[in-house]
Amino acid sequence: MRIILLGAPGAGKGTQAQFIMEKYGIPQISTGDMLRAAVKAGSELGLKAKEIMDAGKLVTDELVIALVKERITQDDCRDGFLLDGFPRTIPQADAMKEAGIKVDYVLEFDVPDDLIVERIVGRRVHAASGRVYHVKFNPPKVEDKDDVTGEDLTIRKDDQEATVRKRLVEYHQQTAPLVSYYRKEADAGNTQYFKLDGTRKVAEVSAELATILG
């Protein structure tokens, strides 16, 4: 079961990735984690990646694909894997295909931008414990105070509206074209494509995923 998750930041991919990993026992493959692990291990690919990153450059698609290929041969990927945040662009998707990495399911989480902004901008965090609240969907008992310690809650820099809207613009420019790319792949019989309404309750989306994935 090889799965790609698509959807804007804040569309609920992370929550559902957790559900899929726990239910089906497959690992989530993050290219960022892979790069860090390869650099730490000092593998040939890791040394190449380190050289590029130390020079302040972006790691090439070829190198990332090579890392993905290496990663999916490991034992924990025997029953499949989950890719979130990769591929981000059509050249990356093409490179994956050319490398012979087959994808069984592409799952798109669809949520309107304004709702994503509301979801993210309303987050409040208790930095010391990592507890997360939301002014509308999961408010603290006392406004802007942590329920347990009574300490102040803060807004993460990444959760500010201007930052969120900028990330959404980048997503629509760069990653959204993958939607039509993978729809065509599904039409050609190379994968299965499903679009999920991410505005629903978490449990409802999870139930639909369980039906799709079996």
UniProtKB/Swiss-Prot annotation:
Region annotation NMP: where it falls in the sequence: 30-59
Record organism: Yersinia enterocolitica serotype O:8 / biotype 1B (strain NCTC 13174 / 8081)
Pfam families to which the protein is assigned, alphabetical: ADK, ADK_lid
Alphabetized SUPFAM superfamilies for the sequence: P-loop containing nucleoside triphosphate hydrolases (SSF52540)
Name of the gene encoding the protein in the UniProt record: adk
UniProt name for this protein: Adenylate kinase
Catalytic activity: AMP + ATP = 2 ADP
Subcellular location: Cytoplasm
PROSITE patterns in UniProt: ADENYLATE_KINASE (PS00113)
Amino-acid biosynthesis among keywords: no
